[in-house]
């Protein structure tokens, strides 16, 4: 529902996409489907004067009906949910000394996610090849690279992977470094593999390269005990560019940071082990209140 809100909210705010728009929601969970339906219908009324047609389909037996004739299919699922599967992804490796922060992209957690999600993706692909063979599959589900790679290599479905980290990358960097005055009118270039893109160029509204000033502020933030985004700032020092994905993700991508024999690195870079389960609990509680 969170991804549905973000992606479809953007669609409803883009005039070129709203003409003759039909949004079809599909889920195997009745209560989650109803939550998504209520949310999207409210966004449709608020931002689009109710012009879009919003439909909903429940259950595997209705999946082909939901997909039939689609031009775009947005995939945002979590097979096995937080409880039990995400908990298991963390607790079993931890038992054997393998620690993780997010565990949704690679490593033990990412592999387990892929193994339980690929069969569902294969079902989606078979149905799409039958009822909407020309549709573009927009994958928001992790592990991004593994799942998108599977769809591209082993199915006939046109697939693109998406992640919201690209949209929030430069804003988070500039705010973190105290450069809020450079936000308005900035232009940027981001490229790279999904879930590990790079901010290759960023300029202010006058076309001035912001990287020299960014680099001049990095060390002070790394030395600041209250600042948390330290892994990515170290990347700037070593590689010259800022990475789109969080420091928590990058601490897993690079084998340097999480080492049982070197716990001081966790402290130095403030790497939060078991971060994703904590986020899940907070998000679930926050969503209930919302």
Question: What is each of the regions a protein language model found here?
Answer:
Residues 2, 32-42, 52, 147-162:
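Conserved N-terminal glycine/acidic-rich loop preference
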Residues 3-8:
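N-terminal Rossmann-fold NAD(P) dinucleotide-binding loop
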Residues 16, 158-178, 186-189:
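Catalytic or ion-translocation cores adjacent to nucleophile or general acid/base/metal-coordination motifs
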Residues 44-71, 78-81, 100-106, 114, ...:
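A structured beta-alpha segment of the ubiquitous adenosine-cofactor-binding alpha/beta core
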Residues 72-94:
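Short, solvent-exposed beta-strand-terminating loops
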Residues 178-290:
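Long, compositionally biased stretches enriched for glycine and/or charged residues
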């Amino acid at each position: 529902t969170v991804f549905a809100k973000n992606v479809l909210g953007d669609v409803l705010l883009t005039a070129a996409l709203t003409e003759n728009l039909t949004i079809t929601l599909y889920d195997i969970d009745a209560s989650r489907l109803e939550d998504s339906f209520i949310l999207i219908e409210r966004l449709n009324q608020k931002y689009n004067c109710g012009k879009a047609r919003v439909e909903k389909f429940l259950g595997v037996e209705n999946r082909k009906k939901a997909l039939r004739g689609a031009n775009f299919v947005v995939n945002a699922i979590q097979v096995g949910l937080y409880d039990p599967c995400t908990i298991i992804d963390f607790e079993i490796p931890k038992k054997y000394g393998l620690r993780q922060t997010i565990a949704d992209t690679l490593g033990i957690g990412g592999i387990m996610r892929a193994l339980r999600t690929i069969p569902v993706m294969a079902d989606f692909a078979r149905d799409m090849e039958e009822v909407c063979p020309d549709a573009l599959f927009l994958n928001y589900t992790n592990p991004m690279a593994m799942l998108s790679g599977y769809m591209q290599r082993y199915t006939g479905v046109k697939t693109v992977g998406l992640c919201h980290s690209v949209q929030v990358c430069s804003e988070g960097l500039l705010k973190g470094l105290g450069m809020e005055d450079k936000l308005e009118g900035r232009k940027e270039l981001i490229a790279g593999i999904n879930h590990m893109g790079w901010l290759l160029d960023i300029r202010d509204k006058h076309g001035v390269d912001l990287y020299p000033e960014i680099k001049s502020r990095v060390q002070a933030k790394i030395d600041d005990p209250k600042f948390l985004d330290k892994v990515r700032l170290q990347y700037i020092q070593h590689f010259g560019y800022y990475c789109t994905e969080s420091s928590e993700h990058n601490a897993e991508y690079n084998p340097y940071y999480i080492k049982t024999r070197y716990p001081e690195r966790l402290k130095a870079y403030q790497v939060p082990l078991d971060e994703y389960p904590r986020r899940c609990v907070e998000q679930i509680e926050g969503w209930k209140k919302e």
